[in-house]
């Protein structure tokens, strides 16, 4: 009897256990990245024995589903190894996914507020760049230069002789303007620089984001979406989006330090500085030193962290000239002295910054988290302006009241042929500060939400150094001026919500949101001496008397030479607000067919409303072959700088220095010219392409695109107040000390057509790894229409003055017709070697031309087919066309991992010392330097500094 009771108890326990294990129970869990400990959103969690039972993790990496106690969960996520977890009756689990090395860098977040997707499965092309991997094996020391080298659709050239453009680094996508690409940090809108480009070969009349205004060490990776995305993100995203993702690492020190310098054995000015004609430096110049530090620390016990980065960069000047001593060695060499730019090259830079990225869950369940990121950066730079030569322009020198020169040692120089000259310095102090903070979480039926505020401010302050206010008669000082500057503030408030509906078709992610943005722009004046004339007296300059010069009686130049300061009439403070709402969705119609769509409405307080939309799709023809395409409308709001910028500055035009007014769009002179209020630029963007992964380690993508932009904002040409054919109602608005004026206007319609190709192959065997990356961009830019203001549209001369052939050439040269890069990287154990080749397509630019040209349709400054006299016969004129033919540069490096904590890199960029062709018509070499930079070359292609050596150390512990 006792035995029977025991057997009955055992049977009851067995049946009870079976009953319990047969009951479904609620399972909760969290999925994190094994490397960073951070939660992963959009991870697929499904019951292995059931095809239809599953879910995805929310924005905090958490999931909930019903399962039987002995079920096996399969947890998968693109870019990570799939994990299987047997429940064994557990109701709470934690899973850490390990990165799948073969698919590292494949996960894409930008372009959709839905779950992440593999790079080759996105409906639009996206480049993913691991900054630390590409930044170490190169001499390039800043983020903008690294992107120019890594992404063929991204283009950037360091400017020289372009006033403020020498001091800020703005890049472009697909040949559009630098302000037609939106920049995000951690998915939040980044503020633009306060600067607007007035000179230079790229981005004339545009603003943009300075990608060097935060530490490169803070960046984990960069996603470049090469497609219009205004419907998803708002203004500026016509060419695409650059999303910068910050590091989240903790307990891991990364310290990188390096040196680089230019070793140009061909065009360093010290090689032929005969007679003190040029400023020059050392055999290796442009020396750069950089130091960066990164580490992170855990906060609390719920997975919180803060990651902190800091960097420092110091770069010296470079000095370049074309060879004037040995024409036999170079058929394009020049037999002349460049008196316009006796100091030509890159300016010097000292910059440093700090940035943080943090996230703190409120509780152990991690459903709600606080996050914040931001930083501070300061840059001091110094660049040479155009040369001042006493024989031609004595009124720009310090003189006594009788016109005799006052010698100022340390500033004035005398060449061996008796010319007295000096080079003013333009200095800038640029401060950039930003902070973002927000709260994100989930609620209800897995609705994710994110409430954030992002603020950023940029201040751009000019100084003139080693220069003069020549109207300060009888005095040689001051020689340093506060020229004033401008600043820009942007504050953005966002609310975003999203939800994944797993039972709609094969899955639908819906995103909704609203944005409120406040912007403020201000110009602040410099000290009086930086812009004012300190005398009403005219001077007879003795060196001009008796030389046949009819105008020896001149007024001394007012203001700081090189960059006249902002005056009290320039000073302005302006602001605006805008409100936007959007909806976007990503629908997996079938397992093969993905459909994306977005709509957005925005209203600006200054110009009104705009509505944009986008439709994108991807179809999986085979498991490894996808076709994709999109069509969208976009817009870019005119920047406050374009609307309100005002300055009187020194411009180099037609071989002469003139005082030019850039009039604000709100001014009476702009209205007299018939220029209306600036409005938004609009675009239509289409793309079609495919992605293919024929084998595990090889991917190939090709994407064609067309972007049509209407009402592009450009900076007009220079109109002279002495032109008798202009309406008096217009010329009467000119200030008395100004010779010419120009304006911002919605004036140009363009079409960009192109093709992007990327082929990526990685092969591993034993201890060897070979990586081959071929990437290219082919494109054509056409100008379809130019809208001339009514008061300036009465003649071909005025039409071409408004937007000249020369300006058209600059716009078309926003990117080369082709740019290709081939990277070969090989590692064996602790050793690494690599070679990177870059092809730059042909660029064609125009000079200013000779105002004395006999051509009836080519008077001075007309901009119509600029021509210059030939060296052989001054009565014969030829077009001043600069053909910068296609070039190929080669970068090489070697690396050694000395220990688990230390690696060393060394090599040379542009190892064969390739330069652009000289900026001159070979038949008119005497006119060399009549280009935008005033030097032997424009700022195009690979730049003019030549070979660059480098060495770097990378510490990890």
Model feature map: region roles:
Residues 64-65, 188-226:
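Short acidic/polar hinge/loop motifs at secondary-structure boundaries
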Residues 251-254, 275-414, 418-420, 427-438, ...:
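Transmembrane beta-barrel wall of Gram-negative outer-membrane proteins
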Residues 512, 704-849:
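Gram-negative outer-membrane beta-barrel transporters
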Residues 30-50, 72-80, 88-136, 186:
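Short, acidic, small-residue-rich periplasmic hinge/interaction motif at the N-terminus
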Residues 64-66, 144-193:
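Extracytoplasmic beta-strand/coil segments of soluble accessory domains associated
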Residues 91-97, 143-146, 150, 169-171, ...:
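N-terminal periplasmic accessory domains that precede
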Residues 416, 422-437, 442-444, 455, ...:
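Outer-membrane beta-barrel transmembrane domain signature of Gram-negative proteins
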């Amino acid at each position: 009897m006792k035995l029977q009771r025991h057997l009955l108890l055992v049977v009851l326990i067995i049946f009870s256990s079976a009953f319990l294990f047969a009951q479904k129970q609620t399972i909760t869990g969290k999925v994190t990245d094994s490397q960073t400990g951070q939660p992963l959103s959009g991870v697929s969690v499904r019951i292995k024995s059931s095809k239809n039972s599953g879910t995805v993790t929310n924005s905090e990496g958490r999931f909930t589903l019903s399962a039987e106690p002995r079920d096996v969960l399969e947890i998968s996520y693109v870019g990570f190894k799939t994990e299987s977890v047997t429940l064994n009756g557990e109701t709470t689990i934690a899973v850490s996914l390990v990165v799948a090395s073969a698919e590292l860098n494949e996960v894409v977040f930008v372009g959709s507020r839905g779950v992440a997707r593999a790079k080759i499965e996105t409906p639009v092309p996206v480049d993913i760049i691991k900054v630390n991997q590409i930044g170490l094996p190169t001499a390039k020391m800043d983020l903008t230069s690294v992107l120019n080298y890594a992404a063929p659709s991204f283009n950037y050239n360091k400017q020289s002789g372009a006033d403020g453009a020498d001091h800020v680094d703005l890049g472009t996508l697909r040949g559009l303007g630098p302000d037609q690409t939106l920049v995000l940090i951690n998915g939040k809108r980044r503020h633009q620089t306060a600067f607007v480009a007035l000179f230079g070969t790229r981005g004339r009349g545009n603003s943009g984001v300075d990608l060097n205004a935060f530490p490169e060490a803070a960046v984990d990776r960069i996603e470049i979406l090469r497609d219009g995305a205004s419907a998803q993100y708002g203004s500026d995203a016509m060419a695409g989006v650059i999303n910068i993702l910050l590091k989240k690492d903790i307990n891991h020190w990364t310290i990188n330090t390096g040196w680089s310098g230019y070793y140009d054995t061909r065009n360093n000015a010290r090689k032929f500085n005969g007679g003190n004609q040029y400023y020059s430096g050392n055999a290796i110049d442009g020396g750069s030193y950089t130091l960066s530090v990164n580490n992170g620390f855990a906060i609390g016990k719920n997975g919180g962290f803060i990651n902190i980065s800091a960097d420092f960069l110091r770069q010296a000047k470079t000095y370049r000239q074309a060879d004037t001593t040995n024409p036999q060695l170079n058929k394009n060499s020049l037999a002349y002295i460049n008196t316009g730019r006796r100091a030509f090259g890159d300016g010097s830079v000292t910059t440093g910054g700090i940035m943080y990225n943090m996230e703190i869950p409120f509780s152990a369940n991690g459903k709600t988290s606080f996050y914040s990121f931001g930083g501070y950066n300061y840059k001091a730079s110094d660049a040479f302006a155009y040369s001042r030569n006493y024989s031609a322009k004595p009124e720009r020198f310090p003189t006594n009241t009788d016109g005799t020169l006052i010698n100022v040692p340390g500033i004035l120089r005398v060449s061996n042929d008796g010319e007295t000259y000096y080079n003013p310095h333009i200095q800038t102090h640029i401060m950039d500060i930003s902070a973002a903070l927000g709260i994100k979480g989930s609620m209800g039926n897995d609705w994710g939400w994110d409430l954030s505020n992002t603020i950023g401010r940029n201040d751009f302050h000019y100084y003139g150094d080693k220069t003069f206010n020549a109207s300060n008669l009888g005095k040689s000082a001051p020689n340093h001026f506060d020229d004033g500057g401008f600043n820009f503030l942007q504050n953005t408030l966002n609310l975003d919500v999203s939800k994944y509906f797993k039972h709609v078709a094969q899955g639908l992610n819906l995103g909704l949101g609203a944005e409120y943005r406040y912007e403020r722009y201000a110009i602040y004046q410099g000290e009086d001496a930086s812009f004012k004339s300190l005398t009403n007296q005219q001077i007879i300059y003795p060196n001009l008397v008796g030389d046949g010069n009819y105008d020896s009686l001149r007024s001394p130049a007012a203001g700081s030479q090189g960059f006249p300061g902002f005056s009290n009439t320039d000073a302005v403070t302006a602001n605006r607000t805008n409100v936007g709402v959007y909806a976007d969705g990503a629908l997996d119609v079938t397992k093969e067919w993905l459909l994306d769509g977005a709509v957005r409405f925005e209203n600006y307080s200054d110009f009104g409303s705009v509505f944009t939309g986008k439709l994108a799709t991807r179809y999986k023809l085979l498991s490894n072959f996808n076709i994709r395409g999109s069509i969208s409308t976009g817009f870019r709001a005119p920047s406050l700088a374009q609307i309100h910028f005002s300055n009187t500055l020194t411009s180099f035009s037609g071989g002469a220095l003139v005082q030019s007014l850039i009039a604000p769009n709100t001014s009476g002179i702009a209205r007299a010219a018939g220029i209306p209020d600036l409005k938004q630029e609009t675009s239509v963007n289409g793309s079609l392409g495919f992605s293919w992964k024929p084998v595990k380690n090889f991917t190939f993508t090709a994407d064609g695109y067309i972007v049509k932009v209407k009402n592009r904002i450009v900076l007009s040409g220079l109109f002279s107040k002495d032109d008798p054919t202009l309406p008096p109602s217009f010329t009467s608005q000119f200030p008395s000390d100004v010779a010419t004026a120009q304006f911002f206007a919605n004036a140009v319609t363009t079409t960009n057509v192109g093709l992007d190709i990327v082929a990526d192959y990685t092969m591993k065997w034993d201890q060897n790894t070979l990586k081959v990356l071929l990437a290219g961009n082919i494109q054509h830019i056409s100008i379809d229409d130019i809208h001339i203001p009514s008061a300036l549209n009465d003649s071909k001369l005025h039409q071409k003055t408004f937007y000249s052939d020369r300006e058209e050439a600059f716009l078309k040269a926003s990117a080369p017709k082709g740019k290709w890069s081939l990277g070969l990287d090989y590692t064996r154990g602790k050793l690494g070697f690599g070679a990177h080749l870059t092809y730059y397509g042909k660029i064609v630019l125009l000079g200013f031309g000779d105002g004395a040209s006999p051509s009836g349709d080519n008077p001075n400054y007309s901009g119509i087919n600029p021509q210059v006299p030939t060296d052989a016969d001054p009565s014969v004129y030829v077009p001043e066309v600069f053909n910068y033919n296609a070039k190929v540069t080669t970068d090489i490096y070697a690396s050694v991992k000395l220990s688990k904590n230390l690696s060393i890199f060394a090599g040379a960029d542009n190892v064969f010392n390739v330069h652009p062709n000289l900026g001159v018509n070979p038949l008119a070499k005497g006119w060399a330097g009549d280009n935008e930079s005033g030097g032997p070359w424009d700022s195009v292609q690979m730049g003019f500094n030549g070979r660059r050596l480098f060495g770097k150390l990378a510490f990890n512990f």
